[in-house]
UniProtKB/Swiss-Prot annotation:
Region: Catalytic, residue numbers: 179-410
Marked site (Induces change in substrate recognition on ATP binding) residue numbers: 345
Residue sites binding ATP per the record: 208-211, 304-307, 348
Protein's job: Catalyzes the first intracellular reaction of sulfate assimilation, forming adenosine-5'-phosphosulfate (APS) from inorganic sulfate and ATP. Plays an important role in sulfate activation as a component of the biosynthesis pathway of sulfur-containing amino acids.
Descriptive protein name: Sulfate adenylyltransferase
Length: 530
């Protein structure tokens, strides 16, 4: 089947390329001294997809009327569906949040220069249509179901500012990327690639992921393509913008995707990266992802169990049901098809007795041996340096993961000393450095002064595999937050002690405390027992 038309019928491409118009715009910016707004990481991701058409039919950040319509009805008020006369489907509010002081200086029709936070490069001009204060509680409840622990709701109340600015965009340039350029394709570029590959009259199923891929993912995507017939193909389309806090970094993941791409039959799959800021919005996010893939020229989209869900809250309650996303998309099937069809994710499992994968819904697990490795177990195996079996993942993928997730024996750590007694703290630092340097291995032991020990510097040293000794008076908690509690040891003077959690007190003599710290480092795998 031919490449589907974009959502709304027109693929937006808002970057102005005419040299004379661009010259006039930059002169206008210089002459009129427009207000400037430096974008946050999420706003930057959103702007890129507005500019390149990934968010078609949007031509800017939502004005108040469109925002309210999306929040309450999952539809745009300004763009109509030609078939039913209703607002066009759009499930996620794309908003530009600003502070009260900045908002108070804006007026309708005014232009704002939007800048990249990394290099201050002007990316776009926004013409103000509306400046409004959203009801964040309503947004939280309608869009994300209201649980205050939901990461998008935490962002809404803890990070997003009080006012939203809606308006249309004139694009000056895309944000600059320096990594994986061949894989960063815009919707226009990806559609052109499909034509070059001869896929423009065939079927393409997109696979969305924010995690590394293993053998099971390769198996399920190949099955999805085969189910489409002899003309089925696969787009591996991972998110490399903002994902869930704690996810594996995109550099590691892209290296994994490059390796696993080689494991597909020739001509079956291609890889492109999506600079999306995920909201982890479950069913609404699945709808959003489907519309985005339509704009990228895909006609089938795999929607998995708990698609784009953030898991469960601190009480163990899931934010979304396992099939909420599939059910919502089925409800709007008539408006999505024939442009894009949802392919329900068929979970596969390994059958060790037969050395093959099979869809779990086709076997009787009470009669057949199955094997699987959970994400938690995989992380533990990486941390311990234990074997990851070949039936689970490819050696090339495991190698990439081990490079980015070394075992504890090669990881760095920080010993954070509460140096309220500066002389004793300095002496303990010296004693620890001397003690730890006597052990064999590649790990360097670095002692920083309180002035040198910013959270960023300590974390960078720990990430490089160093042991860092940090006497500090004020920013102890910030350093531990940056490094992570699993790689931190705390030493305080006359305070609490919990050796099992890496917290030590100098109530005892210095030699005993150093011995306990060394014992703890050995027990956690940072050093091998001699």
């Amino acid at each position: 089947m031919p490449i589907p038309a974009p959502h709304g019928g027109k693929l937006q491409d808002l970057v102005i390329r005419d040299s004379s118009i661009r010259s006039d715009l930059f002169k206008e910016i210089a002459d009129k001294k427009y207000k400037t707004l430096t974008l946050s990481p999420r706003q930057l991701c959103d702007l890129e997809l507005i500019l390149n058409g990934g968010f078609s039919p949007l031509t800017g950040f939502l004005n108040e009327e469109d925002y309210n319509s999306v929040v309450h009805d999952m539809r745009l008020s300004s763009v109509k569906n030609e078939k039913n006369g209703k607002g066009l489907l759009w499930s996620m509010p794309i908003t530009l949040d600003v502070g009260q002081e900045f908002a108070g200086k804006l007026s309708k029709g005014e232009k704002i220069v939007l800048k990249d936070l990394r290099d201050e490069k002007p990316l776009a001009l926004l013409t103000v249509e509306t400046v409004y204060k959203p009801n964040k509680q309503t947004e939280a409840e309608k869009v994300f179901r209201g649980d205050p622990e939901h990461p998008a709701i935490k962002y809404l109340f803890e990070t997003a500012q009080e006012f939203y600015v809606g308006g249309s965009i004139q694009g000056l340039d895309y944000p600059t990327h320096y990594d994986y350029i061949p894989f960063r394709k815009t919707p226009t570029e990806l559609r052109e690639e499909f034509s070059k590959l001869g896929w423009d009259q065939q079927k393409v199923v997109a696979f969305q992921t924010r995690n590394p891929m293993h053998r099971a993912h390769r198996e399920l995507t190949v099955r999805a393509a085969n189910d489409l017939g002899s003309d089925g193909h696969i787009l591996i389309h991972p998110v490399v913008g903002l994902t869930k806090p704690g996810d594996i970094d995109h550099h590691t993941r892209v290296r994994v995707y490059q390796q696993i791409l080689k494991k597909y039959p020739d001509g079956l799959a291609t890889l492109s990266l999506l600079p999306l800021a995920m909201r982890m919005g479950g069913d609404r996010e699945a709808m959003w992802h489907s519309l985005i893939r339509m704009n990228y020229g895909v006609d089938h989209f795999i929607v998995g169990r708990d698609h784009a869900g953030p898991g469960s809250n601190s009480k163990g309650v899931d934010f979304y049901g396992p099939y909420d996303a599939q059910e919502l998309l089925a409800k709007y099937k008539d408006e999505l098809e024939p442009k894009i069809k949802v392919v329900p994710f068929r979970m596969v499992t390994y059958l060790p007795d037969e050395d093959r994968y099979a869809p779990i819904d086709t076997i009787d697990t009470s009669k057949v041996n199955t094997a699987n490795i959970s994400g938690t177990e995989l992380r533990q195996r990486l941390r311990d340096g234990t074997e990851i079996p070949g039936w689970f993942s490819y050696p090339e993928v495991v190698k990439v993961l081990r490079e980015s997730n070394p075992p504890r024996s090669k990881q760095g750590f920080a010993i954070v000393i509460d140096s309220s007694d500066s002389k004793q703290g300095e002496y303990l630092s010296f004693a620890l450095q001397s003690t730890l340097n006597q052990f064999s291995g590649e790990r360097r032991i670095t002692k920083l002064s309180s002035e040198q020990a910013t959270p960023f510097i300590v974390n960078e040293l720990v990430k490089s595999g160093s042991g860092v000794i940090v006497p500090t008076k004020s920013n102890q908690s910030d350093i531990i937050k940056a490094v992570g509690s699993g790689n931190s040891i705390i030493v305080n003077f006359n305070g609490e002690q919990n050796a099992d959690q890496g917290i030590f007190s100098l109530k005892e003599d210095l030699t005993s405390v150093i011995g306990e710290i060394v014992e703890y480092l050995v027990s956690q795998g940072f050093y091998q027992q001699s």
